[in-house]
Structure formats: structure tokens, C-alpha cells
Amino acid sequence: MSKPLVSHIDKEAQKDEFRNILKPIYSNLKGCDRYIRLAILTGVSRFSRLSIFSDLNNLDDISMDSEFAAICGINEEEMLRDCRPGIQRLADYNEFSYDEAVARLKNNYDGYHFARHCPDIYNPFSLLSALRKREIGDYWFATGTPTFLLKSILHKGVNLEHYLNSRKANITSLSSIESYSSNIVPMMFQTGYLTIKGFDRENGYFKLGIPNREVERGLFRGLMPLLADISGDDAGDFIIDSARMLREGNADGFLTGLQTLLAGVSYELTGTKSEIFFENNLYVIFTMLGFDVQTEYHTSDGRIDVLIRTPKYVYIIELKRDSSPEAALAQINSKHYESPFRADSRAIVKIGVNFSTATRNLTAWLIES
């Protein structure tokens, strides 16, 4: 079902047209006060400057009120109390323990917070779908993802990992959408891509992040076709092949595949910030693989561009733009980027990569084990 305002938030003329249609619908409610004892109006967003509710000015907005923070969704106490038979069926069907089933449900569907004081909230649609089908799957994103929002994220030209996991916002900015083009964080919060992860009492702002693995996978699955010329079965094959090669220590094979993937990317997406674009590609791909990946990982003597940890290998990747892989590898060694991982039982693989702004692709790399 199309959402008249949210679906057209990037189209000012249509947004105003729909606003004018919706306004009298809500205005009629105020004239029905004597017939209505209690009414709850729900939706994704409040458009404060659109004046849809200007005539209906006696509403009490409880969107971020801690007293009502758990009014929607299912908290963990409720799930463990009321869904135990379904959780056990899920565990039995997939041949893992009850506790592991709970952990997987939590990892995939928990993590929403809608106010400063709020218990962990599970996505009810996804949780109940998983219990009914006895399968940990991605159910919420089957309902669709707004492409304009994904494109807006990419065109910010920012490091995706930090943008999606280290956002800060005050309650005023999160409460309503003024213009998606100037700040898309409120839209991402209100549509469920970001949620409250903490509160800075001294400075009065919320810390935001991705709620859970289902949202993360769905978001990145939507971003991947925009980052590279790949989708559908080809994307699945690439992810499977990449996972296998990195688990086996075949960094050269992975980088060759990535080079082929990036060859089809248009200049419109990469623009002038090619290095950030490449880092974002790696971050999205490795997150979809399920690996522990961090970009701009800080050490005592510098910053690792990309750090990937698989069960058997720790990959340290340094990116250079219009330089050489030798220079990139020399930086890894001179700054001793491997030092924090020397006690790790996994093999350390250092990779120096050169990225060309002319071709918008990686041109050469050196690997040192």
C-alpha cells in the first residue's frame, strides 16, 4: 500500500497536493468531540510544517513518551512468557537448543527503543512470522524499501559504518520531518532503519544505531544494487563466493572478484569521493557476509582503513588513492597496524590496495601474510 506523504516526500508538489487532501479528513474529527471518548492516530511520521493537524490541535503526541514506549511491539518478557511453545518448535525444527533459538530471535528482531526509557522491543511482524514459519528470515523488508532514502544515504558521501552506527540527534529533530533532503536521519528513525541506542544526559541527545540484523541485512541488500552493478542471483553468487574465498584465505581471488564488480559502477554514484565509495562497498559486502568488519579502525599509531575478522584470518586493508599498493603496504608495516592482533590465534593478512579515481576501481594490490 502506498503511503501518500512518505512515498512522495522527495516530490514537493505532490506532497502539498496530498496534504491538502488529508487535512480536511483530520479536521472533521475535532467536530466529533462529543462522540469520541478515546482515539489513537498512528502512522510513520509527523510532518510538522505541513499543517495537516493544524485544525485538530488537541492531540497529545505520545510518540516518544517513556510511559507509552512499549505500547507497540513485543518486549522480551512478553515473548518468553507467551511464545515459549513457538520458540521450542522453532528450536526443534532447526535442531538447536531453546536458548539458542531465543538468542537468534533477539539478534534478528529485537533492539528497538522509542523513548529515553524503553525496554527492548521486538518487531512483532517479523517475530511472529519466524515462529509461525519456524524459520529465521527477513520478513519486514518483504514489504518494500524506499529507494529514494537509500540513494540519499549514498549521496551524502559519508562513511556508512559511522553514519549508521554513530548518529546523534535531539528529541526535536527526531519528532518530525521537515525536509528529507537536508536531514534524512529523522526519516530513518521513524521508518525503523535507526533506533535509540543510548542517551547523553549531559548534552541532551540520543545515540542512534541500526536495531538488529534483519534491518541491517535488508538495508544493505537495498544498498548493494546502488553501490555496484549487481542484484538478484548474481549478488547472491558473489556473496557466497566471497565468503568462501575469505574463509579460505584467498584474498587475491576476492579482490579480483571485487574489481570485476566495481567495473560496472557509474560515475554518478562514485563522484569525487571514490575512496569513501570503495570503503562503503567493502563495508556493505562484508556485513552481508556476516563477518566482523570495521572501517577506520583506530590503533595507537594510526587508523586502519578496513579491518575484517573471519574465523581463521584477520585482514588488514590499507587503501591508497592514485598511489601504489607498495605505499599502502608500507604504511601498514611502518605504523604496525598488526600490533593489536599479535596475540590473536588467527593468521594476519596485510593488504595494500591502490584505488584509481580515473577508473573508479582498484588497479593493483599487494598481499603479505
Protein language model features and the residues they cover:
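Acidic-basic catalytic patches of nuclease active cores, encompassing PD-(D/E)XK
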Residues: T260-Q294
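Active-site metal-binding core of divalent-cation-utilizing nuclease and nuclease-like domains
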Residues: I285-P311
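Switch/connector loops and helix/strand junctions flanking conserved nucleotide-binding motifs
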Residues: P4-V6, S48-S54, P325-A328, A358-A364
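Domain-level recognition of nuclease-like catalytic cores that cleave nucleotide substrates
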Residues: P340, D344-S369
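Mg2+/Mn2+-dependent nuclease catalytic core
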Residues: K15-N20, R321-E338
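Phosphate-binding site recognition
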Residues: M1-S274
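Conserved catalytic cores of phosphodiester-cleaving nucleases, focusing on short active-site segments
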Residues: L282, I304-R321, K335
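Metal-dependent nuclease catalytic cores in nucleic-acid-processing enzymes
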Residues: I25-C32, P186-L194, Y283-T287, F291, ...
